[in-house]
């Protein structure tokens, strides 16, 4: 088991550089870079109702049996989307989990139609360990895929997927928190910053 964990850690490091838990980031500078496109933003879905649970996790279409965005979570996601548009952050493709809280976050933040996929959908204990590993690998590949010129890719997923893909540094990732990756031509990506929802909103308000 220890050997397996070591191999997995090496594999993650091989995909990503500078992926640290407490990256200090100049938000204004990062926004200017995002305005040029070329980044992948991996976001945990927005704030949810804490008195709800996914009671039918095998059927993501069954929205009534899911933990959904709270009213405040929905409002914050909408404000983040407005901030992105005010800041001039161009969004190309938006990939989301099939669960409604991720789909809704993607639409509100990205402002475009979303592509829901099993690749970034939380599997938890209802899919096999092999399938969870496949989804982690798929998320890493998406984060390391350069977007179309002049655009940024948004991926809205879940805490377990993010931890599985990028490591334990993301154990405390909050709802609505985003990690910005810079893909390169070699098929790898560098984590260049982690931002809370409030960071986008405050930066936009200061303009």
Residue ranges of model-derived segments:
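A short, acidic, amphipathic alpha-helical segment used as a generic capping/interface helix at domain edges
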Residues: 136-147
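Active-site-proximal alpha-helix that buttresses catalytic centers in soluble enzyme cores
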Residues: 24-119, 123-127, 133-135, 169-198, ...
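Positively charged n-region of N-terminal signal peptides that target proteins for export
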Residues: 1-4
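Histidine-centered catalytic micro-motifs
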Residues: 43-48, 155-162
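Generic beta-sheet signal
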Residues: 38-40, 148-157
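Bacterial N-terminal signal peptides
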Residues: 7-16
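Sec/Tat signal peptide C-region and signal peptidase I cleavage site
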Residues: 18-22
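Glycine-rich phosphate-binding loop signature in dinucleotide/nucleotide-binding domains
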Residues: 87-89, 146-150
């Amino acid at each position: 088991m220890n050997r397996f964990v070591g191999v997995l850690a090496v594999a993650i490091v091989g995909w990503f550089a500078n992926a640290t838990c407490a990256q200090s980031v100049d938000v204004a500078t990062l926004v200017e870079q995002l305005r040029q496109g070329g980044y992948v933003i991996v976001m945990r879905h927005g704030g949810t109702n804490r008195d709800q649970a996914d009671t039918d996790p095998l059927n993501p279409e069954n929205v009534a049996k899911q933990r959904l965005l709270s009213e405040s979570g929905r409002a914050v996601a909408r404000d983040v989307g407005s901030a992105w548009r005010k800041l001039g952050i161009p969004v190309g493709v938006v990939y989301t989990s099939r669960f409604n809280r991720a789909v809704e976050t993607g639409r509100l933040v990205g402002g475009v139609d979303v592509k829901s996929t099993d690749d970034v959908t939380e599997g938890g204990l209802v899919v096999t360990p092999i399938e969870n590993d496949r989804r982690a690998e798929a998320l890493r590949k998406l984060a390391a895929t350069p977007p179309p010129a002049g655009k940024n890719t948004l991926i809205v997923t879940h805490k377990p997927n993010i931890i599985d893909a990028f490591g334990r540094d993301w154990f405390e990732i909050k709802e609505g928190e985003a990690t910005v990756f810079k893909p390169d031509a070699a098929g790898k990506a560098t984590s260049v910053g982690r931002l809370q929802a409030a960071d986008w909103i405050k930066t936009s308000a200061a303009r």
